[in-house]
């Protein structure tokens, strides 16, 4: 028998739900060691761009599109055509869009004011007191958070064992900075706060007169004012829920921020009460897009249609015939856009080389321990839990493991001596000359970062034969690689070899959780070279020839060098194949570096590209995924020989082999979602760098080992550094939402979307575009939302910019 809740209990439940919704409106950020791209609009994917723009403008002053001038320049240059503008205009809400095409163009030529967030109580108090309370809160909160969240950087670690709120309370009751600034009695105010974060939030909401309708918006704003610290707490919640648990940290941070608001209200209420009443009411008003925001969304849509038109023209060009006989080499790369340049170069070196694209973790979601390490590296997409465990080498490398551990302990002891409070002064005097050689080699870029050189990884525990066979079959079918195997098949993971770069993991493989991809590739090569596994695959219709050898490789995206792990599977019969592959890879690397040099600042030729990763002063060792704008899942023949400029994710997929459309479902729910996170992180860091970007690399300091701050402290900066999206003179990334192109029946695509609401929301609300390719690989159908499709007009390959032949 259930009992009705008391009004107070019901109110508390509603408040708790509002706090939870505010927490989920915040995107997570991963620590630097395993940094991956995250969609900064993750909490707004249930809304359209214009509606999300209204919400984010209210709580953080965020613009969700580029300034109007950016669009106007492209209209004037003819990049965005009248057809693009008209089609985007027709797709917008009738009651909010400009009256006609002329009005839309006039709007593009006019500036709009930068959005301003509703003021917090800290902002209002700053206005009447002259004290920068928002800045002081950010500084004091950041000083505490850097210690609390520290992952080993601090020599004197903060005490652990308490929740975030209790830990902050213990520190802040001894911090007199707020009182010196004029907030008298703040330490006492903190000390007498309720024990639970939820009770603190409830008390603050009551004292501030916050109505239920205003809570979601106001709580969201409070977390946004904490910058990357709130995002890191959201990461803790993400990880806990992925493991089947929960985490209270982000709620604790909301309570901390509200204690500041509450204290400032008690201090300045007589002077700010009228303005606060107006602000509170505004927080309670429904979120709605404005005509200006709809106009901005139309211009954004038009820019994307222009890019889609260019892509359609590229895909409409006559296809190159598939390799008729056995390929001279097959090389599978990650779908990462950087692989597109190298794959095209490799195919041009020898047209009988077949390249494939697949998610860089190669279907093996493993928690891996490197040599001499007890740390589990989650080398898998962050959407997944590890299904396997692996380690570097077996019992035969035990002595090497012990030796490496001794070296690591000695290095840590040396580091503690070097940085300790007392010995650091003597250290410089006593050992400074020893570092002359290192300083010279580092300054001249003569010493690269150590490359991955662990023994071949092994599954631990090992899988039985049936599980190994099932895993191999699943991966090969997902790769659409079930026949016509070459003598040598290379499985190339990718990584980046850079120095002096806190964001180095962001250059690694996102599908491998921010680590390089050689471990997964080496595990798969071992699986596919297993003769018992091959025998088990034959009844399943996958016959791998006895003379086929699988080898793992690592593609260094900074230098375009390819390292083959030939020693993992020695084969005298394949020495010529391996030598020839190395020659082809070297030639392709030279071509790829030459192409990339055209985009990189101060890269005069391909030779200078290879040195950038070793330069301690280089803020742009490579462009990583800047410029990404398309995802194509189709047979490679649809794109072979056509330059996509390193801006497209390429996933091999043959729907005719996918009888149950299980692979299609996997592509839409995993690689497409990961690619959307990447694309939208670049988008957010470009259109709103002050909120969704990491700031200026030249000002970065690593804090807590988890992230960066600009200068000496303050808010953690999440997202991409400015140097990752801008070359100093112009943008290196065009902020366009990703266009996903899939060669598969529309009914099958719609069926997958109908069973995955979160994925469908990305397309229905316009965060991604979706196209179905016809059997010639042309963009034939556009997804119109609500599981509906509209036919695209034929694209003339000879006309790079077709125009509508209608009067407007």
Curated annotation (Swiss-Prot):
InterPro entries: DabA. Its main location: membrane. It is a peripheral membrane protein. GO terms for cellular component: plasma membrane. One of its GO terms (molecular function) is zinc ion binding. Pfam families: DabA. Zn(2+) binds at residues 334, 336, 494, 509. It comes from the Bacteria. It is found in: Cell inner membrane. Forms a complex with DabB. Part of an energy-coupled inorganic carbon pump. This is Probable inorganic carbon transporter subunit DabA. It comes from Rhodopseudomonas palustris (strain BisB5). The gene is dabA.
């Amino acid at each position: 028998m259930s009992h009705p809740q008391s009004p107070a209990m019901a109110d508390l439940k509603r408040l708790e739900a509002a706090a939870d919704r505010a927490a989920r409106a915040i995107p997570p950020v991963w620590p630097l060691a395993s940094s991956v791209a995250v969609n900064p609009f993750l909490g707004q994917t249930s809304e359209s761009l214009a509606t999300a723009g209204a919400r984010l403008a209210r709580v953080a002053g965020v613009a969700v599109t580029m300034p109007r001038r950016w669009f106007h320049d492209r209209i004037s240059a003819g990049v965005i055509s009248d057809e693009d503008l008209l089609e985007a205009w027709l797709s917008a809400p009738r009651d909010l869009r400009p009256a006609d095409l002329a009005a839309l163009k006039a709007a593009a030529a006019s500036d709009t004011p930068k959005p301003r967030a509703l003021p917090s109580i800290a902002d209002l108090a700053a206005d009447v007191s002259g004290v920068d309370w928002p800045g002081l809160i950010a500084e004091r909160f950041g000083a505490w958070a850097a210690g609390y969240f520290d992952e080993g950087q601090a020599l004197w670690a903060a005490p652990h064992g308490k929740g975030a709120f209790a830990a902050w309370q213990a520190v802040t009751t001894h911090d007199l900075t707020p009182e010196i600034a004029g907030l008298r009695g703040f330490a006492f105010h903190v000390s007498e706060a309720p024990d639970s974060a939820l009770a603190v939030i409830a008390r603050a909401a009551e004292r501030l007169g916050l109505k239920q309708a205003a809570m979601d918006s106001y709580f969201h704003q409070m977390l946004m004012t904490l910058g990357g610290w709130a995002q890191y707490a959201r990461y803790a919640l993400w990880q806990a829920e992925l493991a089947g648990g929960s985490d209270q940290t982000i709620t604790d941070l909301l309570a901390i921020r509200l204690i500041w608001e509450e204290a400032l209200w008690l201090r300045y209420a007589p002077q700010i009460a009228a303005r606060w009443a107006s602000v509170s009411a505004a927080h309670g008003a429904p979120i709605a897009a404005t005509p200006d925001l709809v106009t901005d969304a139309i211009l954004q849509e038009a820019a994307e249609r222009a890019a889609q038109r260019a892509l359609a023209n590229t895909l409409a060009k006559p296809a190159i015939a598939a390799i008729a006989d056995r390929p001279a080499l097959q090389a599978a790369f990650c779908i990462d856009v950087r692989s597109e340049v190298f794959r095209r170069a490799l195919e041009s070196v020898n047209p009988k080389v077949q390249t494939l694209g697949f998610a860089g973790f190669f279907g093996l979601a493993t928690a891996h321990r490197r040599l001499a390490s007890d740390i589990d590296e989650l080398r898998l997409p962050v959407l997944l839990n590890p299904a396997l465990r692996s380690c570097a080498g077996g019992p035969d490398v035990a002595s090497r493991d012990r030796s490496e551990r001794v070296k690591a302990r000695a290095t840590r002891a040396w580091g503690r001596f070097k940085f300790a409070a007392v010995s650091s002064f003597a250290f410089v005097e006593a050992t400074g000359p020893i570092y002359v050689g290192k300083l010279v080699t580092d300054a001249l870029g003569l010493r690269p970062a150590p490359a991955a050189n662990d023994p071949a990884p092994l599954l631990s525990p090992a899988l039985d034969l049936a599980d190994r066979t099932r895993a191999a079959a699943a991966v090969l079918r997902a790769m659409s690689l079930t026949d016509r195997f070459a003598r040598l098949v290379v499985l190339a993971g990718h990584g980046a070899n850079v120095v002096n770069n806190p964001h180095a993991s962001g250059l690694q493989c996102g599908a491998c959780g921010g680590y390089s991809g050689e471990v997964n590739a080496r595990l798969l090569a071992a699986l596919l070279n297993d003769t018992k596994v091959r025998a088990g695959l034959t009844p399943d219709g996958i016959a791998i020839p006895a003379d086929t050898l699988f080898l793992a490789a690592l593609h260094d995206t900074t230098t375009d060098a390819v390292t083959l792990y030939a020693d993992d599977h020695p084969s005298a019969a394949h020495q010529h194949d391996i030598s020839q592959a190395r020659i082809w890879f070297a030639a392709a690397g030279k071509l790829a570096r030459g192409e990339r040099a055209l985009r990189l600042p101060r890269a005069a030729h391909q030779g200078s590209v290879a040195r950038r990763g070793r330069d301690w002063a280089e803020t742009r060792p490579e462009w990583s995924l800047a410029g990404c704008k398309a995802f194509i899942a189709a047979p490679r023949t649809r794109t072979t020989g056509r330059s996509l400029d390193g801006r497209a994710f390429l996933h091999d997929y043959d729907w005719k082999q996918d009888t149950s459309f299980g692979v299609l479902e996997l592509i839409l729910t995993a690689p497409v979602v990961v690619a959307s996170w990447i694309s939208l992180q670049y988008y957010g860091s470009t259109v709103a760098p002050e909120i969704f970007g990491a700031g200026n690399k030249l000002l970065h300091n690593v804090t807590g080992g988890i992230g960066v701050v600009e200068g000496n402290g303050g808010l953690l900066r999440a997202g991409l550094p400015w140097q990752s999206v801008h070359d100093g003179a112009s943008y290196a990334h065009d902020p366009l939402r990703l266009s996903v192109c899939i060669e598969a029946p529309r009914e099958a695509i719609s069926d997958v979307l109908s069973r995955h609401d979160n994925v469908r929301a990305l397309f229905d609300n316009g965060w991604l575009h979706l196209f179905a390719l016809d059997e010639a690989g042309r963009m034939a159908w556009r997804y119109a939302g609500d599981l509906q499709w509209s036919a695209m007009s034929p694209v003339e390959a000879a006309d790079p910019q077709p125009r509508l032949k209608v009067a407007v």
